[in-house]
Every structure is written in C-alpha cells, then in structure tokens.
Design a protein with these regions (language model features):
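Alpha-helix N-cap/helix-start capping motif
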Residues: 3, 26-29, 49, 126
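PLP-dependent aminotransferase-like
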Residues: 36-95
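A structural motif shared across PLP-dependent enzymes of the aminotransferase-like
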Residues: 1-11, 72, 171-173
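Generic structural signal for small/hydrophobic residues in well-ordered secondary structure
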Residues: 13, 31, 45, 63, ...
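Phosphate-binding glycine-rich loop
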Residues: 7-45, 55-62
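Short coil/turn segments at beta-strand junctions that form active-site/ligand-binding loops
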Residues: 20, 43, 80-82, 101, ...
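Active-site region of PLP-dependent enzymes
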Residues: 94, 102-198
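Structural signal for conserved beta-strand scaffold positions within catalytic alpha/beta enzyme cores
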Residues: 24, 68, 104-106
C-alpha cells in the first residue's frame, strides 16, 4: 500500500461531492484548523451556540475571539463567520460542494461515512489544495520519496489521514455504506453555558 490510495480516495470524494479538489486529514477539527491557519485569519469567529465542543476549543487554542450566535439554527453544516470555512462534519452528500467555500468533513463515529477517524477539506482552488495537503502532511510533498530527499519544508502539521482509513473510506463510499442523512440531525448542548479555561 502506498500514498496513491490517498489520491484515489480524494478523487472518489471529489466525484461524489462535486468538489474539484479534496484534501484528506485525520479529523474535521484539524481540517478547520488547517483552513484558518492557511487563511492567516486573526479576527473574531462567530459560531452557532449549539455545535460540537472541539470547534470552540480550537478557536480558543488559536487565540481567536469567539462569539456565539444564539439565533443561528443550522442543519448538517454551518459557517465559521465571517470566513469561508464551513464545519460540514454532518453534511456529506452527493454534489454538496458550494464554490467559494472550504467545507470540512468528518468520517468519525456517528458520521455518514463512518470510517472511524478522518476528515477532509473540499475546495475549488488548486493552489489551496497543494498548500493545505502539504500542511496536513508534516510539510511534506508526498510525491517526493523518500521524504528525506525533500530540501524545503513549509510549516506542516501531523494531521494526515492514515492509508488504511483511506482504503476503508473508498470501499465504503463505493459500496454506498453511508448512514441515513436524517441520522445527522443531532441536538448539541448550549455552549453559552460552558467556560473554557487554560
């Protein structure tokens, strides 16, 4: 098994979602982090007050101001306003991609394509694809083998999808082993009632 399985899964997701470019990651939260770091966004972030806890934790980790919009009702995906980054962890669907967005998917427990762990970024920019893919893979360019032959490294993170997960995801997508879309309508707790310390 080699890195070509990652590109195979990227192509399968591209065809399924309608996104021209797909970057695989180890989680949706890390996909969101990569997008915000890549955009060098340093302003405030507005989230719905009901979402999974890892997203406000990430905003705190990045040192960004966080505000909650208690009137923001969402299904399947929401925007990290005012950016073009979307938490699409529960939105995986055929032809779901919207141009101009960076939509971040999850393949974790309970998600439509439940690989076990993993995420992806959908984008319409080839440049974004190459930079984000390098960032997700320790600053490595995966076509250079062995990696020790690479001379220049941009800042990278160990947020890559494992090869085994890509193979499993591709098989599940091909066999249409997706959970029912309605199973993705989850009631999250009110995050206005929590405090993040540290």
């Amino acid at each position: 098994m080699d890195y070509s399985v990652l590109e195979d899964f990227e192509h399968a997701l591209s065809k399924y979602t309608g996104s021209p470019w797909v970057i695989l990651t180890d989680s949706c939260t890390h996909a969101i982090e990569l997008c915000l770091r890549y955009l060098k966004y340093d302003g405030p972030i507005i989230l719905p007050n009901r979402t999974y806890l890892s997203v406000p934790m990430l905003i705190h980790k990045l040192g960004l101001q966080l505000y909650y919009d208690k009137d923001y009702e969402w299904k399947y995906e929401y925007r990290l306003a005012p950016t073009n980054v979307w938490d699409s962890a529960r939105a995986l669907d055929r032809k779901m991609f919207v141009n101009g967005r960076m939509q971040c998917l999850s393949f974790g427990p309970g998600k439509r394509l439940e690989i076990g762990r993993g995420g992806a970024i959908l984008t319409d920019s080839r440049n974004d694809y190459y930079i984000l893919k390098t960032m997700a893979n320790d600053g490595r360019r995966l076509h250079i083998s062995p990696w020790q032959d690479q001379q220049f490294f941009s800042l990278g993170f160990h947020y890559n999808m494992r090869l085994e997960e890509a193979v499993r995801g591709m098989e599940m997508l091909k066999n249409k082993e997706l959970k029912d879309k309605k199973s993705q309508l989850v009631k999250y707790p009110n995050l206005l009632n929590i405090t993040i310390e540290g």
